[in-house]
């Protein structure tokens, strides 16, 4: 609701009215407020309640750049260690799913739900393959802004042709990354992964624009 613009920046939120608005008890609302505060989407008021924060395109871009560095490091370390058969199979499954998705030459909103799932899995497999838990911890600290992590995906429903080109290109990058990993080309894998993060910079453009069309924006997040 915050990212979609239904709850605009500056709006004050209090537990009871919000719970009544959503038709739920106070406890899940209280927990959601705390989580959103940690993610940087809400700021706690001195008295009661919270206020919806303004998230700038510059903040998103900065967090995405940091993610690229961390995931690039994960890719390099995974390539240098070598991939075990289970990891290779998991990555190949992600590639195969994406190949089928983009083969028809267009994408639907439902397709983007599928993309969100296998893309998140793709990134997680590489992070785990690095064998470096510090990377996961650092990413968790960085993922406090919307779209700083791969757990969130924004789709511009007003221009699905453009979104097809953008995500199809990102999937082609998936193929190149896997090729570098399999061939144990650490420097190449790192460079490709960092460049891959730049595909998310479109979010900084979307949310940094004063003319953002919230109605045309579909946000897909982990449940």
Regions inferred by a protein language model and the residue ranges of each:
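Conserved amphipathic alpha-helical segments that form helical-bundle/coiled-coil interaction surfaces
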Residues: 85-156, 173-176, 180, 188-200
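Short amphipathic alpha-helical segments at helix-loop
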Residues: 10, 48, 52-55, 106-107, ...
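Short linear motifs at protein or domain termini
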Residues: 1-86, 134, 206-223
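Amphipathic alpha-helical repeat elements characteristic of tetratricopeptide repeat
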Residues: 68, 92, 168-172
């Amino acid at each position: 609701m915050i990212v979609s613009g239904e709850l605009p920046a500056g709006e004050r939120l209090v537990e009871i009215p919000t719970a009544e608005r959503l038709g739920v008890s106070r406890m899940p609302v209280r927990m959601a407020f705390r989580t959103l505060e940690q993610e940087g989407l809400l700021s706690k008021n001195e008295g009661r309640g919270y206020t919806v924060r303004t998230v700038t395109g510059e903040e998103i871009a900065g967090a995405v750049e940091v993610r690229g560095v961390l995931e690039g490091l994960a890719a390099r370390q995974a390539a240098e260690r070598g991939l075990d058969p289970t990891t290779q199979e998991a990555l190949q499954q992600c590639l195969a799913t994406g190949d089928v998705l983009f083969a028809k030459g267009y994408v639907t909103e439902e397709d983007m739900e599928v993309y969100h799932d296998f893309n998140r899995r793709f990134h997680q497999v590489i992070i785990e393959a690095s064998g470096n838990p510090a990377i996961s911890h650092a990413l968790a600290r960085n993922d406090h802004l919307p779209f700083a992590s791969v757990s969130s995906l924004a789709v511009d429903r007003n221009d699905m042709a453009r979104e097809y080109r953008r995500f199809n290109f990102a999937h082609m990058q998936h193929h190149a990354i896997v090729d570098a990993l399999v061939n144990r080309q650490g420097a190449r894998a790192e460079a490709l992964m960092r460049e891959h993060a730049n595909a998310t910079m479109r979010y900084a453009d979307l949310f940094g624009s004063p003319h953002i069309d919230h109605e045309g924006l579909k946000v897909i997040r982990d449940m």
